[in-house]
Curated annotation (Swiss-Prot):
Any one GO biological process: intracellular protein transport
Subunit structure: The COPII coat is composed of at least 5 proteins: the sec23/24 complex, the sec13/31 complex, and the protein sar1.
Name this polypeptide is given: Protein transport protein sec23
Annotated localization: Cytoplasm; Cytoplasmic vesicle, COPII-coated vesicle membrane; Endoplasmic reticulum membrane; Golgi apparatus membrane
């Protein structure tokens, strides 16, 4: 099968099962697996939308303990004897009574060959309706606060009618609003400079009275009972009160001197929000949505002092360990994040500020709980408003496209073991025979909790081969390795659902089996390696991580390239490997690993989003797409992400996922400024100028978070966003004297892709390794 046909096959599997594997044939032995360099791993999107798939209204059939695998198309079913053999543990299980009518030609949906992914609606109801607690920063300008209030009031109409809503505001003090008290505005005030233990919060709010017990769930869709009912009200009953309270919100009255920052107690407000839900709604789906317009400057979790002369920490400060508040703040927010994750509650962070807000310190609140993270310049921006509204997108049945209180468990056959997960989750510390000896990401477990989950939430799951090799290792007949992903989550409709995805792939034959190399999915592999690199970058120095990326690339090319000894020019890669070095070139230059020109908050945001998206979107972040428009051809033409693609008579459309940029070449910009497009006879120029805008609108249509939209001209200041992403094939050092200018010259010391590939070829050929060891500054 040729590469294009394989790509189509992998794409069909992704559409059906929401999964992409780095290797689609598994090695037979651990030794063979170690020689692959790129680990056996999967990018899995549990809730990938499948509108044609039926929702089964009965409980799944599971194998006996301790296996607990769910019946799937790979199970061997004996219709006459009414038994099925589990492909994971090979145990025989009786079929339940309601399967009595099945025959060879009439089988239930979960046994159909195409039902490798199936979803069940479980009988177990959710313990409470979805809960939304808005935590609002009042230390902001009037116009920004008004815009935020308007957006929050609008969001009330997007919530399910039975959803519970609470409101906490904070500035110098944190206030919990008692929405159930209608006589006048009433709130409980917490001092911003004081750290409150969980029990203190609960005592002050009067939450220690008898409430719903964890093992006694209340009826779904009913309003809460007990003390929490004063603070959390159903939208359908209390929309008027909640709207009134939001409309009456005022700026924090505490005076702020010109040389000071506002006193902002973000840590106390978050601590109170976590404590409020922890007592009354443990393991019930809920979201704490934080809207902050500046850094925390007092109380627990503050990231900078109130004096403006004291700057926010930079990457340089962190590298030099010149960080006065950082470690204490991280410890505080991490403890809150663990509490929220253990209770099944999501924390979303929405920042509307030109300066940093402390996202770096708070990042694990979102990372541990599967929350959203959004970085915008202001709450007045359309980027914030449209992104926030998209959080509440609904499906065809008018249910929110979000799952609550989710967990993911991975089962494997004896050939495979799970080594870990990289994504927005925490470990459930569940041990089983599927758990591997090594650790990659969040390891030593086969189950993870990811309180918040949506249709684009994707996770990198990593595996190892269990077989040590030896004479008994290779067994006769076709062999396969299998994995099953079990995702339990609270659906927005009020019931728990279970989505089951079962994956089977062949095992390779003897050492040197060519099917192994042919099964390499370079796109999935690039994204999975990028996740490992970002995971490492959070704990290691940036240069060390880049060196690791380079080493892995050299080893992979050395293993799978064709070349002649001592001849770098003979270096060739098969079609399914050719783009991988290019992906790694752009990854090592990306904002995920290069922190220069980015604040720590921006780096935390970019890495958060990368770990949330599937293969297609993550690849756009690593290697942006570039399209060209000109009068010579109709529509857009994909072009190389290279400085040579900049032409005076062309318009370029760059998509980096975070930015959508339209760049007008020098001549096009002059024509536009002269107004030719508005004159008769120049309709083709007008159409040319409009086409990239139309395409940009399509790109923006379903993207979260909404990207920043930039329109610029050659030579303009905003053009730097494009130039920083291009391969610098034409720099100030490469142009010949007096040569004609046909492309943009980029002033940079970065090496070009061609130079990078030249060095890769030298390093990948073992006998050439000594030749390049004497290079002064090898780029790889």
């Amino acid at each position: 099968m040729d590469y294009e046909a394989l790509k189509d096959q992998w794409s069909d599997v992704e559409d059906r099962d929401g999964i992409r594997l780095s290797w689609n044939t598994f090695p037979s032995t651990r030794m063979e697996a170690s020689r692959l360099v790129v680990p056996i791993a999967a990018v899995y999107t549990p809730l990938k939308e499948k509108p044609d798939s039926p929702l089964l209204q009965y409980e799944p059939v599971t194998c006996k303990a301790p296996c607990r695998a769910v019946l799937n198309p790979y199970a061997n079913v004996d219709v006459r004897a009414r038994i099925w053999i589990c492909p994971f543990c090979l145990m025989r299980n009786p079929l339940p009574p309601h399967y009595k009518d099945i025959t060879e030609n009439a089988i239930p949906p979960e046994l159909h060959p195409q039902s490798t992914t199936i979803e069940y609606q479980l009988a177990r109801p959710a313990p409470a309706p979805p809960i939304f607690v808005y935590v609002v920063d009042t230390c902001q300008e009037e116009d920004s606060l008004k815009a935020l209030k308007d957006t929050l009031i609008l969001s009330l109409s997007l919530l399910p009618p039975n959803a519970l809503v609470g409101l906490i505001t904070y500035g110098t003090m944190a206030q919990v609003h008692e929405l159930g008290y209608t006589e006048c505005a009433k709130s409980y005030v917490f001092r911003g400079s004081k750290e409150y233990a969980a029990k203190q919060v609960q005592e002050m709010l009067g939450l220690l009275a008898a409430g719903p017990r964890p093992n006694m769930p209340q009826q779904p869709a009913r309003p809460p009972v007990g003390p929490a009912a004063r603070f959390l009200l159903p939208v359908q009953q209390a929309e008027f009160q909640i709207t009134n309270v939001l409309e009456q919100l005022q700026r924090d009255p505490w005076p702020v001197a010109n040389d000071k920052r506002p006193l902002r107690c973000t840590g106390v407000a978050l601590s109170v929000a976590v404590g409020l839900l922890e007592t009354s709604f443990q393991n019930a789906g809920g979201r704490i949505m934080v809207f902050t317009s500046g850094p925390a400057t007092e109380g627990p979790g503050h990231v900078v002092g109130p004096e403006l002369k004291e700057p926010m920490r930079s990457h340089h400060d962190i590298d030099r360990d010149n960080i006065k508040y950082y470690k204490k703040a991280v410890k505080f927010y991490d403890a809150l994040a663990k509490r929220a994750a253990n209770n099944g509650h999501v924390v979303d962070i929405f920042a509307g500020c030109l300066d940093q807000v402390g996202l770096l310190e708070m990042k694990n609140l979102a990372n541990f709980t599967g929350g959203h993270m959004l970085l915008t310049d202001s709450f007045t921006s359309s980027q914030f408003k449209q992104s926030f509204v998209r959080v509440f997108d609904k499906d065809a049945n008018d249910n929110l496209l979000m799952g609550f209180n989710a967990s993911l468990e991975v089962l494997t056959t004896k050939e495979l073991k799970v080594t870990g997960l990289i994504g927005h989750a925490v470990s459930l510390n569940k041990k089983s025979s599927s758990v591997g000896e090594t650790e990659c990401g969040i390891g030593n477990t086969c189950a993870w909790k990811m309180c918040g989950i949506d249709p684009s939430s994707s996770y990198g799951v990593y595996f190892e081969i269990a077989n040590q090799g030896g004479p008994a290792a290779v067994q006769p007949g076709p062999q396969r390795g299998m994995m099953q992903f079990l995702t339990y989550y609270q659906h927005a409709s009020g019931h728990y659902h279970l989505r089951v995805t079962t994956v089977a792939r062949p095992l390779s034959g003897p050492t040197g089996d060519p099917t192994l190399a042919q099964s390499f999915d370079q796109e999935a592999a690039a994204v999975l390696m990028a996740r490992i690199a970002v995971y490492k970058a959070d704990v290691d120095d940036g240069p060390d991580v880049i060196r690791w990326v380079d080493r892995m690339l050299i080893r992979l090319c050395s293993r799978f390239a064709d070349y002649r000894k001592d001849d770098p020019t003979s270096f060739r890669l098969e079609k399914n490997f050719t783009l991988y070095p290019q992906f790694m070139f752009h990854l090592r230059r990306s904002q995920f690993l290069q922190v220069f020109n980015n604040s720590p908050d921006e780096t935390a945001f970019y890495r958060h989003v990368l770990n949330h998206e599937d293969v297609g979107d993550a690849l756009v972040m690593i290697q942006p797409t570039l399209d060209s428009y000109s009068l010579e051809h109709e529509g857009s033409q994909p072009v190389l992400l290279d400085s040579a693609s900049i032409q005076p008579t062309h318009i370029l459309l760059l998509d980096t996922f975070f930015h959508i940029l339209i760049f007008h070449g020098e001549t096009i910009a002059e024509w536009r400024k002269a107004g030719y497009q508005d004159q008769e006879g120049y309709e083709n120029l007008k159409a040319l100028l409009e086409q990239p805008k139309e395409d940009a609108r399509e790109l923006i249509a379903d993207r979260f978070p909404l990207p920043r939209f930039i329109v610029c001209d050659a030579g303009g200041s905003q053009a730097r966003f494009l130039l920083s992403k291009l391969n610098p094939s034409t720099t100030h050092t490469t142009g010949g004297y007096g040569g004609g200018v046909t492309s943009q010259t980029i002033f940079t010391d970065d090496v070009s892709l061609q130079t990078f590939m030249d060095h890769l070829m030298k390093y990948a050929i073992p006998t050439c390794f000594t030749i390049v060891m004497n290079d002064a500054n090898p780029p790889i």
